[in-house]
């Protein structure tokens, strides 16, 4: 057990870092679509239910494991189980997580490429051909993915306080302000409130196994659970910090970010008569068309895309820290 292990500098910063790790692309390009495909408000209610009853307790367990062992997943599971079998479990979790991260890096590299285009020429329908050309260039994709990885490695190299804390304290509040601004601008559109109320109204006829498992999966996916990130971040928590409060606060802000993204994306897409989609299609095809029709959309779209890249970058930092800190 590492008694001299680095620790987060305050309880508030701990929550900021946790939120930065949890909020990512899944909250922005997956959550709104999942709501739309699964009955809107019905999906939201089940998502909240599973978050409160299952995801928050699971996060509490992961944070507790990390703090009590003062180590990453591999050593933490070995210590908790008291056998080499626990070490194997830790290795499996870390390796699975790192493998899935390789795909996330490519996506984030595409997002970095798109952010550069947006900063120079805006983020609207006119830029779609340029995005597609970049995404079709495999070498360019790998180059940007490597740039993102190097950036994440550098932040981790700086340490918990000088690296992870410092970038989180800048990016998380910035992203929150951008989301608030986008939601306010969206609800200035005529009829946006009506679209949102209709979308949030539960449709109980949509309740089935697919909806239930989708909501359960989103609750776990959204908080970054899986025995890696929250274990390593838990190892940096102070002994006197209330883990339950930290887990609940992280879940609250993470879910709030997902809901605010929905409040921005759904009314905008419906207002302009576009089809809801998910993943890259939503981000690089549907949203540019919406921004093109939105007053001031050239600027608003650029701000949105750059802020999204920055907050998604924090998830990559957390992944690199979880992998490097566990091995």
What are these regions (language model features)?
Residues 59-63, 67, 106-114, 158, ...:
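Short helix-terminus and kink motifs of transmembrane alpha helices
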Residues 2-4, 8-10, 165, 169-317:
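Membrane-embedded translocation segments of transport machinery
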Residues 47-55, 93-119, 144-158, 173-186, ...:
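Hydrophobic core segments of alpha-helical transmembrane domains in multi-pass membrane transport
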Residues 11-50, 101, 186, 190:
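Transmembrane alpha-helical insertion/packing segments
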Residues 1-29, 56-63, 67-79, 84-88, ...:
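Membrane-interface "cap" regions at the ends of multi-pass membrane proteins
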Residues 2-6, 33-38, 68-92, 105-161, ...:
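Inter-helical loop and helix-membrane interface segments of multi-pass membrane transporters/permeases
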Residues 26, 46, 51-63, 73-75, ...:
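Central hydrophobic cores of alpha-helical transmembrane segments in multi-pass inner-membrane proteins
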């Amino acid at each position: 057990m590492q008694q001299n292990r680095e620790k987060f500098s305050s309880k508030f910063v701990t929550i900021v870092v946790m939120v930065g790790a949890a909020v990512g692309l899944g909250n922005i390009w997956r959550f709104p679509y999942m709501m739309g495909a699964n009955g809107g408000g019905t999906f939201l209610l089940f998502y909240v239910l599973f978050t409160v009853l299952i995801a928050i307790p699971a996060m509490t367990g992961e944070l507790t494991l990390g703090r009590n062992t003062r180590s990453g997943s591999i050593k933490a599971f070995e210590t908790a189980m008291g056998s080499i079998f626990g070490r194997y479990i830790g290795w499996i979790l870390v390796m699975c997580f790192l493998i899935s991260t390789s795909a996330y890096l490519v996506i984030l590299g595409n997002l970095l490429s798109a952010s550069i285009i947006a900063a120079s020429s805006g983020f609207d329908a006119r830029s779609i051909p340029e995005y597609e050309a970049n995404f079709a260039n495999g070498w360019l994709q790998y180059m940007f993915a490597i740039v993102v990885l190097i950036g994440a490695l550098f932040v981790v190299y700086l340490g918990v306080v000088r690296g992870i804390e410092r970038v989180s304290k800048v990016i998380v509040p910035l992203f929150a302000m951008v989301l608030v601004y986008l939601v306010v601008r969206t609800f200035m559109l005529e009829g946006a409130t009506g679209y949102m109320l209709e979308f949030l109204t539960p449709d109980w006829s949509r309740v089935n196994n697919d909806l239930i498992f989708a909501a359960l999966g989103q609750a776990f996916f959204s908080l970054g659970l899986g025995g890696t990130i929250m274990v390593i971040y838990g190892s940096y928590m102070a002994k006197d910090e209330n883990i339950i409060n930290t887990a609940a606060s992280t879940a609250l802000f993470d879910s709030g970010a997902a809901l605010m993204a929905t409040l921005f994306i759904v009314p905008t897409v419906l207002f302009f008569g576009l089809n809801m989609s998910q993943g890259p299609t939503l981000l690089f095809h549907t949203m540019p068309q919406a921004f093109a029709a939105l007053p001031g959309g050239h600027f608003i779209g650029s701000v949105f895309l750059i802020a999204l890249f920055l907050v998604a970058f924090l998830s990559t930092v957390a992944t690199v820290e979880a992998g490097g800190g566990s091995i």
